[in-house]
C-alpha cells in the first residue's frame, strides 16, 4: 500500500510529540511492508528560498517532501493558519507523483484543512489523526489569553476575538475571506474558522483520536464524525529499557520532561517543592533555548535558582531516555492544558516509573491513583505537594509489576490500515 503522511513540520528540524507520533506510525507501516512518503511544510519566515518550492530531504530512510511556504504569500496570518488555497496546485503535484492509496493527515497547521475535501475529490481516501485542538482553537491549546481553560470556540467564534486577536475587537468583518492583511479581513477569517474547520474535518473518511476525552470534546463542538474512533498512543518496541532499580530512593527523585512552556507548567513543580516535607529532588529536562518561551524560562530559572534540590538538565535524545527514567523515582506532569496522553507518560510506565499528573483531559484515562501514580488538581502547587507526599509514603505504589502493559503502535496501525483500505 502506498501512503502519504501529511504534517505541518517534521524531523530533523522539529521533534515534538506530533512529529514523533508520525514517525513512529511511518516506521510501523514500513514494518508491515507499506510504502510511506511524508509531506511536510517548511516554514519560511525570511524568504530564503523561492516563495513556494517543493524539495526533498530524506529522513530515517523515508522520502520526505518539503513544501517551502514563504509566509507572506498569504499575509493574513489568521487565514493562513487554516486555509491556503494557493497551495492546492502544489498538493496535486505531490499526489500525482506519489499516487497514494490513502493520505493520513497528522497536522495541517499553515497547510490548510481544505486539503481533506480536495483529497476526497481526487479519489484518494483521507484519514485524520487529531493530536491537539487545532481544528477547534486558533491558539491550538484551548487555553485563553489569561491561561483559563476553554471548552471550544465560544459564541460561534466571536468569543475567540478577545482571546486570539484582541486588536480586532472594534473591527467590521469583510464580506468574504481573503489573504489581505487588514482588520476586516482578519476578523472575517477568524469568524469563519469554526465552520470551515468543522466542514472540512467531517469530510474525512475516518478520524482518530488518542483519547476518549478528545473524541468527546470534538463531538461536543459539532465534530461528531460518524467514523470517529479512539486509538491510544503507543510506543515503539524497545524504545525504553526498564532498569532494575529499587524505588523509592532518598531523597525522592522527581523528574519533569517536556517543553518548558507555561501550559506544561514546570513552575507548578518548582513551587510545590517548597511545601514538600520529605527529602526530595527535582530534575527538569527540556530545552533551555526556546525563543517562544524565553521570558517564561527565565522566570522559571529565577524561581528555582536558590533551591539546590532543583537541577536543569536540558533536553535528551531517544538514546538517553532509558537512563533518564532509570535515574527517576517519579515523573511529574503538572500541565495546565488538556493533555491527551503525552508520550513521556507512556515512557515512564514502560520504565516502571509512577506518574504524578494533573487531573485533566486524557491524563485521567491513563494515570490511576494508587496503581501507577497519583492525580492532583491542575494548577495547584499545594495539591501537587500533597500528591508527592502520598506517593513518597507508599512504597507499594512503586511496584511496577502492577502497571498495565504499555501498548505498542502495532494495534493502532492495524486500525489505520483498515481505514486506508476503506473497511
Regions found by a protein language model. Give the residues of each.
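A charged, aromatic-enriched C-terminal amphipathic alpha-helix characteristic of glycosyltransferases
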Residues: 395-423
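Short, structured helix-loop element that forms part of the nucleotide-activated donor/catalytic region
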Residues: 47-56, 220, 283-309, 320
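Short hydrophobic beta-strand element within catalytic cores of glycosyltransferases
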Residues: 333, 345, 354-357
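Acidic anion/phosphate-binding donor-loop and adjacent secondary structure
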Residues: 219, 225-229, 234-251, 323
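A conserved mid-protein helix/loop that constitutes part of the nucleotide-sugar donor-binding site
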Residues: 20, 261-275
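Conserved acidic donor-binding segment of nucleotide-sugar-dependent glycosyltransferases
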Residues: 369-370, 374-381, 390-395
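N-terminal subdomain of nucleotide-sugar transferases
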Residues: 1-57, 63, 96, 122, ...
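Carbohydrate-associated surface elements
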Residues: 42, 213, 234
